[in-house]
Amino acid sequence: MELSLQGKTALVTGGSKGIGKSIAKTFADAGAKVMITSRKADVCETAAAEIGNGCVWEAGNVGDPDHMEQAIDRCVSELGGVDVLVNNAATNPYAGPMIDADLPRWRKTIDVNMTAPFAWTQLVWQKYQKDNGGVVLNISSVGGLETN
């Protein structure tokens, strides 16, 4: 079965490398217009060129409300909307036992891995999907199921 996403738009956080980049490339190859976000502009620019199909990018901190707003507004104005939101950006600043993690690392992990996907989803819904429908994909890893 061939995947067709003609006429659809996708916004992929953490889309400049790894799973996010692969998802963005798969969507673009299936005909979707794609925006990727990530922290580093140079990495975003290279990834967008490799993804192809007119992929656009917006560099910024996934947890920054101004970045969220700017990326979503740009996706709507330049690509026509946000039919698919992929919350892929994640961090794991500390891979040791939880009891040894310091509070700033813990807060960063919670902010990036839990608060940011909630905020992106809420903002996309308020700005676009509420009246147009859509799909939200939240990506996670086995790290969310294992303890140390």
Predicted regions and their residues:
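The beta1-alpha1 cofactor-binding region of Rossmann-like NAD(H)/NADP(H)-dependent oxidoreductases
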Residues: 41, 59-71, 103
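Substrate-binding pocket helix/loop in short-chain dehydrogenase/reductase
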Residues: 96-98, 105-107
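A short, exposed helix-loop element centered on a Lys and neighboring polar residues
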Residues: 121-122
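Conserved glycine-rich Rossmann-like NAD(P)H-binding loop of the short-chain dehydrogenase/reductase
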Residues: 30-46
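Conserved glycine-rich cofactor-binding loop
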Residues: 9, 16-17
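Conserved NAD(P)H cofactor-binding loop of Rossmann-fold oxidoreductase domains
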Residues: 89-94
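Residue(s) in the substrate-gating loop at a strand-loop-helix junction
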Residues: 141
